[in-house]
């Protein structure tokens, strides 16, 4: 894995400007690019190694340690399954789509059989959705905003599954936090790669957009002044 890898080590080999970004944060950056109206949300990416990200005020909010939204190692079941991080009961060990297939079955294969109505697959799916719902409830206890669900598993979720998931979240939510939107991510191909590139170009793009916005306001102000002069 890449545990312990530092930016300094990467920079020595690449010889170009570098930055490190969590894949979930990168995917969230792409969400902002795809939807300019997005302001506040908790993003939950159900990859084989799940993760999360926080969007606040229309921007990715990573915090001082660059790890806001890292829900994958939030304790979901105290003393539960062993996680690769060394702890037990982490969200990763219950919400990874790798927990869905039976022996020798692929993740797409699981969802294919699920669509056929196989009872045992339905039971496994229901249990998995319960765990995902509880993870979302836990995350929203800190940031009670809207929720975006993405990642490999989300690509296989139908609208009915998303609605079912929201119902499970509401059923577990404390009073006063059950009014929110829950939708599927855009699930674009290579979304995290797109987001990582956007993160690197963020200041440049903000400069262009900021200049354009200042120009628009200046033109509007000039037009208003001219109108006032004509009225006099």
Predicted regions and their residues:
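ATP-binding/phosphotransfer module of carbohydrate and carboxylate kinases, centering on a glycine-rich
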Residues: 12-16, 35, 87, 91-232
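Phosphate-binding/catalytic loop of phosphoryl-transfer enzymes
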Residues: 1-86, 90-91, 208-223, 231-232
